[in-house]
Amino acid sequence: EAKNTLIFIHGFSVPSYIWDDTFKSACKKGYKSVRLDLYGRGYSSNLDSDYTDELFANQVIELMNELKIERATFLGLSNGGRVISKIAYLKPELIQKLVYVSSSSFQEHKPMNDTSVSGKEINDFIKNNYPSISKGQMLDFKYPQNFKGWDDKYEQLLQYEGFARALISTRKNHVNLDLENKFINDSNIPLYTVWGDSDSAVVYNNFKNKLNKLMPRRIEYFISNSGHLPNVENSVEFEDILYNKILKEN
């Protein structure tokens, strides 16, 4: 009989391959494991709609229904932390545990009055960002020299029509998730936060006081020698904590 179900949610722009190492190790260990590309990323549809946390949450919930998964442990990386917070708020009965990895769910956001995306914005984004956006992915690592070719993988994403619009729309639809995160803390859902010790993309010290107020009962871990992607950069330490601590706790 398989162990518990793990659902891996990727971050802002890099799709499900960001979870490759952990997904494969989880499968080998006998966990039922699911990963997916959220709308606008990788192989999923590029929708002509607002890319909100709720859109992504409902996408995951629909997939769970399709696969007849009743409950799961969710691992949300970076922007994926926002998605798992929204899922837990909408459907807490689906949640076994929540694992936030380098999560951007706790930052401050000022709601935008206009969340539409114009053709000019898309063209400007492609012109100004596409030449360097792949190389910029290397900044997620503490030691980028150890991950040659990581940026080439990202370059393939730029060929998909609708990718730029999805990124712009997602950013424009970011709002504070204080209500959702407080709801989670007040629930009985086990919750964990995991951080790279040298993350320059989501800087822990910028929001740790807010996080301590919102989620004081969380259990927290820091992964050594890693930046924004501790699951990739120090997979040995990350997986030791995941399998031998987080997933073993009742």
Please annotate each region the language model reported:
Residues 76, 80, 84:
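Gly/Ala-rich beta-loop-alpha elbow adjacent to hydrolase catalytic centers
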Residues 18-20, 44-50, 109-111, 204-205:
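Conserved catalytic-core motifs of eukaryotic protein kinase domains, centered on the activation segment
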Residues 85-90, 97-128:
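Flexible "cap/lid" loop of the alpha/beta hydrolase fold
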Residues 217-250:
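Catalytic active-site module of serine/aspartate enzymes centered on a nucleophile-bearing elbow/loop
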Residues 35-75:
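Active-site loop/oxyanion-hole signature of alpha/beta-hydrolase fold enzymes
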Residues 109-115, 125-185:
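Conserved alpha/beta-hydrolase catalytic His-Asp/Glu region
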